[in-house]
Amino acid sequence: MTFVIADRYELGASIGSGGMSEVFAATDLLIGREVAVKMLRTDLAKDVNFRERFRREAQNAGKLSHPSIVAVFDTGEVDRDGISVPYIVMERVHGRDLRDIVREDGPYSPSQAATIMIPVCHALQSSHEAGIIHRDVKPANIMINNTGGVKVMDFGIARALDDSTSAMTQTAAVIGTAQYLSPEQARGKPADARSDVYAAGCVLYELVTGRPPFEGESPFAVAYQHVQEEPTPPSEYISDLSPTAALNVDAVVLTAMAKHPADRYQTAAEMAADLELLSRNAVSRAARAHVEKPDEPETVVVPQRLSTPPPPPTPAMPAATVAAPAAAPTAVGSRPAAARQPKRGSRALTVLAIVLTLGVIGVGGAFTYDFLSNSSSASTQQIPNIVGLPENEAVLELERLGFTVVLTTEPSPDVAEGLVIRTSPNVGSEIREGATVTLTISSGREVVTIPDVTGLTLAEATREIEGAGLVLDQSIREENSDDYPAGTVIQQNPRAGGETSVGASITLTVSTGPSLVRVPVITGMQWSQAESNITSLGLVPDIYYVDSLLPEGQVISASGQGTELPRGSTVTVEISNGMLIEAPDLARLDVDNALKALRDAGWTAPDTSLIEGAPIPTGALVDQGRIGFQDPSPGQPLRKDAVVNIRLYRFDLTALVPEP
């Protein structure tokens, strides 16, 4: 049985499911577009708070527009078994996610992995600039389509997951996310754009090694490692890397995965810039910075809430700095050789000693996130709320606090020219004193000319509108139109040719075709009267005059009488031409009287059209010269101008002699 949502989206087979939702292949019946519909699980939809957050975040995700972000076209709610279930209508992507690709095909080379992660970081940067933190960046949320394009999914949905007070925390969605959870999220602190950078680093780690950076028997065990432990450098799992190539991939991955947000790439765009270098096997900025600064011994921070102090940590060996020729480029599509086992060294022994100490004093795995939140951190400064301030005031305030300020500009439909749109990192983020804060300043509205889409199909109009940087309002009106075919645009608001802001919404009115009219019954009427009955309704008569016994001009038949047809439809009408008469009975009339009888019946042919055939012998002298046969027979239809065939009797004596 076909299931249609909102009288528009026809659901097909289920194409995926997760901890909190199920995804169906679907068709947008209005414009014939292939889409995917994600529906929240019914047990989670019972939580009103979660449902509201899901709806709000879906709307936020729908505001994003980037080629590497799976587009959200529509949202709504549908009744399922008496429960109002939210759904999201998304772009349908044909391909595989990175989780399945790595599981089935093995890890990527560092340059290949970097090539994949570049558009991921660009997508994240676009999202962050729109004020949306993904919060659930992981391989399962990154698709590679059938043409090799990269698509990031589920923008904004994870915020609903983090903010929920429902039993959602027990679902597989959280368990799967723990492997890519930033330390600040594990501590229960707010996430910002750098939390997504950390998760992107975890994904990059898995792409080049074939395994996540941390694994454990429970989500808590994994989260604890994100907070307290350093990951094994990814180069330890990659064969055939030169020292320089190993340093390069390690620097990019571990910079993204720095424990403190201030030590990471501060924006996804910064990470993308280093990935560009890594994809070309060029030395990344992170690797260059590592080589240029003096090595510092690693230390392990022991939680402060233990009742008995653990043994002092054993310092790990400082990372070596080497200079060697750059690694030869790896062919696109190739995969590295089998990974070798990591060399753990004294750092691994130190971590093991701490874990054993925790086990001895009975703490085991029963820590809480509150415990993790007490880990020590470096001195930080909070970014003040300067959004909406003039540029000079904002710069002075940040410099007063000791931050380095970088300025960028972009158009904004909502923020006046010269005012701060946002900061990166976000307002309220805690970063190290002296760190760089990027201010995005409004350059005012960016305007575009509204294209004329009247007369186009809805699919064509959608492409024109989106190509102009505008958004199609999903509330599409429908009206009858005698001038525009069904499915084409009748009106648009705002009108074509005007100017509006990029991202503005365009509302369309689409034709459902002409209005319906009821065809009147006109059979038996004179056409001179019936014609106005047809044409006054906007119907078009198609007239055929036919031979008929009915009076000339009388309607014999009309198509569609009593039914409803679209205005402008053709009605076929048959009208009598009055050319038929009933043939009179000419039996035993002479030719003159026969002609008179024909004329009286309405026959208009010349006298010569009364054709005499072979005579009929008769022994009755009285029938001599009279008609004994006629064609057509009496009472049969006869065209007024048609030939009439007759045969006359002729007296013949032989007819009196009986045959022997």
UniProtKB/Swiss-Prot annotation:
EC id: 2.7.11.1
PROSITE patterns registered for this protein in UniProt: PASTA, PROTEIN_KINASE_ATP, PROTEIN_KINASE_DOM, PROTEIN_KINASE_ST
Domain PASTA: 377-443, 444-512, 513-577
EC category: transferase
Active site feature: 136
Organism superkingdom: Bacteria
Name of a matching Pfam family: Pkinase
Domain Protein kinase stretches: 9-278
UniProt keyword terms in alphabetical order: ATP-binding, Kinase, Nucleotide-binding, Repeat, Serine/threonine-protein kinase, Transferase
NCBIfam families: PknB_PASTA_kin
The name this protein goes by in its record: Probable serine/threonine-protein kinase CE0033
Organism of this sequence: Corynebacterium efficiens (strain DSM 44549 / YS-314 / AJ 12310 / JCM 11189 / NBRC 100395)
